[in-house]
């Protein structure tokens, strides 16, 4: 069984300042994200041991831990990749066209996404729904409650308090605005291209 590892950041810890502080990035990546990696590895080890011994007394808890920590790990990995010190602006190309087609305009999409970010107690996601073949905004509680089965995340924004409270206090809206100052549309567009190639 392979061990999951904490990925390195694609930029320096202070690279997103003044929008997101070095302290928050350090805590968030090195402590919070690491805890999900550790929790996922531990849960998978428990499941492997239980399958070997046939004793499943701890299996239910481990299954829940895989879901919680796995989603936390995977979404955080996307979150780091979706920011850059050279970010900001709006999407272009095929992704921009699809956002306009599915939401009416970029402005409509962003307004709805910001509502999702304000409503969620976990994550705001832009996902591709392969059943309806359209983009959707999703408000996810924790890491794994409220997700749309079968959908593929294109963009991930962490709105847990540990993402912003040190920098912005209870003003989550200012943190969301700050995220859009550092958003990197290139990997998001690549995610979109990859998933559309599978279903359209």
From Swiss-Prot:
Keywords: Manganese, Metal-binding, Oxidoreductase. Gene3D superfamilies: Fe,Mn superoxide dismutase (SOD) domain, Iron/manganese superoxide dismutase, C-terminal domain. SUPFAM superfamilies: Fe,Mn superoxide dismutase (SOD), C-terminal domain (SSF54719), Fe,Mn superoxide dismutase (SOD), N-terminal domain (SSF46609). It comes from the Archaea. Its EC number is 1.15.1.1. InterPro entries: Fe/Mn_Superoxide_Dismutase, Mn/Fe_SOD, Mn/Fe_SOD_BS, Mn/Fe_SOD_C, Mn/Fe_SOD_N, Mn/Fe_SOD_N_sf, SOD_C_sf, Superox_dis_Halo. GO terms for molecular function: metal ion binding; superoxide dismutase activity. Its cofactor is Mn(2+). It holds the Pfam family Sod_Fe_C. It catalyses: 2 superoxide + 2 H(+) = H2O2 + O2. GO terms for cellular component: cytoplasm. Mn(2+) binds at residues 28, 76, 158, 162. Binds 1 Mn(2+) ion per subunit. PROSITE patterns: SOD_MN. Destroys superoxide anion radicals which are normally produced within the cells and which are toxic to biological systems. Belongs to the iron/manganese superoxide dismutase family. This is Superoxide dismutase [Mn] 2.
């Amino acid at each position: 069984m392979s061990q999951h590892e904490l990925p390195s950041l694609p930029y320096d810890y202070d690279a997103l300042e003044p929008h997101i502080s070095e302290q928050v990035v350090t805590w968030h990546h090195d402590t919070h994200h690491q805890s999900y990696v550790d929790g996922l590895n531990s849960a998978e080890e428990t499941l492997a041991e239980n399958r070997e011994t046939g004793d499943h007394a701890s299996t239910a808890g481990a299954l829940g831990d895989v879901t919680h920590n796995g989603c936390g790990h995977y979404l955080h990995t996307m979150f780091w990749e979706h920011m850059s010190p050279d970010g900001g602006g709006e999407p272009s190309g095929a992704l921009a066209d699809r956002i306009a087609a599915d939401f009416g305009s970029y402005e409509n999409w962003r307004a709805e996404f910001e509502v999702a970010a304000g409503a969620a107690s976990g994550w705001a996601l832009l996902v591709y729904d392969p059943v309806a073949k359209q983009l959707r905004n999703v408000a996810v509680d924790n890491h794994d409650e409220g997700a749309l089965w079968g959908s593929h995340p294109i963009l991930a924004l962490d709105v847990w308090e540990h993402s912003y409270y040190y920098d912005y206090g209870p003003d989550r809206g200012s943190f969301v605005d700050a995220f859009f100052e550092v958003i990197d549309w290139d990997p998001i567009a690549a995610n979109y291209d990859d998933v559309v190639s599978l279903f359209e």
